[in-house]
Amino acid sequence: MLDGGMVFTREEGWKEMKLGRVFKGADIITVNKNRHEITNSQYVAHLGSHHLFLEKLEHELLPITNKTIIADGATWIWNWANASYPEATQILDFYHAKEHLCDYAQVQFKEQAEKHKWIDEQCLLLLNDKVSDVIQNIKEQKTITKTKQQKQSLLTYYTNNSKRMKYKTYRDEGLLIGSGPIESAHRNVIQKRMKLSGQRWTIEGAQQLANLRVLNKSNQWGSLEKLIKMAA
């Protein structure tokens, strides 16, 4: 899983800290039908270029077979996945897909009841591998001036990602369909320590602290302690 969040730097203002979370299917515990817990994860973080971030991430992916990549639809992520892991299962985060749908419906429908009913119907179709039906239903909505651009944007987003939106199939295979674990990881690994009130980081300092946070949350703190003892 991959995601980005902003930290405030002295040199460049707000700058994206990219975070990757790698875990095995065996580390996912089902608490109930709507909740899962991940017992062990490896993290990587990088402030800046996605090329350097991906180099770090690929190191953690090496031992993983039958890879699954869940992301929000950023083009650079899918380009990387297609080039580096063409055999991997790619999944568009369901909740981002729903968010785009809701944003469109918010301006398309005047009546709240009608809006919610339409959204629920489309989400049910998505969860049953019927993204093509949803695309057709969006096309059939009357185009009004204020939604023309948003409608086309939604259609493009769904069409470009349709092969990554087989949510029933993924669930039947025991796969996650949401990027909640990486979003919560960003809060826990990065933001909880690096977005406190008044904080401004040098780029170098932010990266160094992120490296320490990643080691800690990946249960690799012991390796750092060994290096310190060896250097003492």
Q: Each PLM stretch: what is its role?
A:
Residues 1-232:
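Catalytic center-proximal scaffold of phosphoryl-transfer enzymes
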